[in-house]
Amino acid sequence: RVDRIDPESKTVYLESEKMIPYDTLSCNVGSYVPMTIVSGADRDIFPVKPIEKLIHFQERVLELTSQQKITIGIIGGGPSAAETAGNIWRLGKYYCKNMPDITILSGQKFMARFTENVRSRILHSLTKRGIETLEQEFVREIKTGEITMESGQVHHKDLILLAHGIKPYTVFQKS
């Protein structure tokens, strides 16, 4: 297992203390979503990383929407939140008995690091599909079925998807 990478010496250091030199290196180590804002049991709370978690989320959406209309909250204001919202909408439109209501809780500003043109086009695309985007406030805590904002306001959701603060695994932090 990789511990760290030294690009200066072009060496990969393993946890076993073995060293592997390289000429060219491709790193596909993945990333994860911090779960620090989740308290208590995490039933029906799914991070977007690793990708296997999204498969479980999809199965749960199909299961619940076969019985009733549900609400889905997506935590995050970047490309992952936008992409997963669109994918959930498509899943709902073509495969769900009951279309879910989808809300993105994006923190201060949705797609903040992008130009206003890009941001407004994405917002328009989501809005015309009935996907709500809430801005201007960060999430303080998440429990099963409940998203609490910093103001204390609570949003009740049947399923919660975490697409915020995606981090690379520690191999790059050590390198």
Each model region followed by its residue ranges:
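Rossmann-like NAD(P)H-binding beta-loop-alpha module
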Residues: 57-100, 105
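Glycine-rich, phosphate-binding/catalytic loops in enzymes
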Residues: 42-45, 90-91, 121
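FAD-binding core/adjacent interface of flavoenzyme oxidoreductases
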Residues: 1-73, 161
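A Rossmann-like FAD-binding core segment of flavoenzymes
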Residues: 3, 92-175
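Internal, well-ordered alpha-helical segments in soluble enzyme and binding-protein domains
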Residues: 53, 57, 80-84, 118, ...
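Short, glycine/serine-rich, charged loops/turns that create anion-binding
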Residues: 33, 79, 109
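Short amphipathic alpha-helical segments
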Residues: 37-40, 86-87, 172-175
